[in-house]
Amino acid sequence: MKLNFIITKLQASIEGKQEEFFKSYSSLTDDTKAWCIVDLVNSSNYRLLKGPKLGYVRGETFFTLIKNVISANNQVRLIKEIGDAVLLASDSLRPLLECVILINQISRNLKLTQPEEIYPFEVRCGFSYGIAKKLIRHNEDFLGSSIDQLARIMSVRSTTSNICVQEEAYSHFEEILKEYNSFMTISEPKKLLPKDTKNLIQDITYREIIIDWENLLKFNDHFVDWRK
């Protein structure tokens, strides 16, 4: 069988499905959520430097950290694992924010108790808000511009914060965010440069969330699910 025939046959089988995809799209349900990505920083470089065994241990430590923190809060769903990162979702930003704060504080503790000079244990986090289509796939998945924007926001590298929030999420949940202002400040809006958005035709504006870690430990409100 000639290669050209094989290619033509495979292409026809794909094109034949497109009409079915158009029809099935209208049946997909919309889900409006707060979204969060938590990423293990420099995981690939750490594996290259330290080898696969230590890289595996660090990766499993990260995923255990995520799962142990979110298990106390039934409002947070682990949608999927993406390499050395996770996509989380909730109806409100509050449970995601509290999970991320706890994850960050524990990461800071691990960084101090298990010192690593070149690639210390660190996480990077981002939030967004918006509608996404729930896809019909073997594993649960979603498709939407709010998740696309969040993925781009995760490219931000800052010396002041490792937590960013999409402007839409900030606007929608601003009053909730203010409840944590005894240890948390929010930057002025910033815009992602085209080079950081993979030429996305939509502007992305975000803010940095800066945590005062000493004042966090004096905070006696909220975090209800972990105080039980």
State each model region's role.
Residues 4, 42-45, 68, 73-74, ...:
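Detector for Asparagine
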Residues 1-24, 159-228:
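Intrinsically disordered, glycine/charged-rich C-terminal tails and inter-domain linkers
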Residues 30-31, 39, 84, 91, ...:
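Acidic-enriched, low-complexity/disordered segments with a strong bias for Aspartate over Glutamate
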Residues 28-30, 51, 83-85, 130, ...:
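Glycine-centered flexibility motif
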Residues 90-203:
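Catalytic beta-strand-to-alpha-helix segment of the class III nucleotidyl cyclase homology domain
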